[in-house]
């Protein structure tokens, strides 16, 4: 999943401003509408997926738990799209060895339902790490990582 935005290493992260915990919700999407199949789409208020992210003392990215997936999603941080994209972003920021995070993923929509569950989880994870770091990145800078996770 290489995105490699080397310009992100120029971003200054204020380690004193890093939060201990954040929670982000990302809604389901509908993109298969009549003649606008995969062209027209919209987000809905519910359902959606939720990510809780915690700063921990040991560096690295780990999955603490996944709820609502029926045991189908990997807890291995290298094989889960949420944690893999967070890890990639931290590498590109040049701080992957300086920070540790644990992720709780709460799935509120069925996997394979066509509601954009994997996209919602990935976006929530990336917005969560950005919020944890004090929001140093713009939405445009986060976008390549969101696309990579999808």
Segments the model singles out, each with a brief description of its role:
Residues 2-113, 131, 135:
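ATP-binding N-lobe of GHMP and related small-molecule kinases
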Residues 78-81, 121, 138-141:
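Short acidic-hydrophobic sequence patches enriched in Asp/Glu that either
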Residues 86, 126, 143:
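Generic structural marker for isolated residues within well-ordered, non-membrane alpha-helices
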Residues 115-138:
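DPxDG-like acidic metal-binding loop motif
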Residues 137-150:
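Alpha/beta catalytic cores of group-transfer enzymes, especially the acyltransferase/condensing modules
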């Amino acid at each position: 999943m290489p995105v490699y935005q080397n310009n992100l290493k120029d971003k200054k992260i204020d380690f004193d401003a890093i939060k201990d915990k954040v929670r982000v919700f990302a809604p389901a999407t509908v993109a298969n509408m009549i003649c606008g199949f995969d062209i027209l789409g919209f987000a809905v208020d519910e359902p959606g997926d939720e990510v809780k992210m915690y700063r921990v003392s040991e560096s690295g990215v780990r999955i603490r738990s996944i709820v609502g997936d029926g045991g189908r999603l990997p807890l291995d941080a290298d094989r889960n799209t949420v944690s893999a994209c967070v890890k990639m972003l931290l590498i590109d920021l040049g701080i992957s060895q300086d920070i540790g995070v644990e992720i709780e993923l709460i799935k509120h929509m069925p996997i394979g339902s066509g509601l954009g569950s994997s996209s919602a989880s990935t976006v929530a994870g990336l917005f969560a790490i950005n919020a944890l770091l004090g929001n140093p990145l713009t939405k445009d800078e986060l976008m390549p990582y969101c696309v990579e996770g999808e």
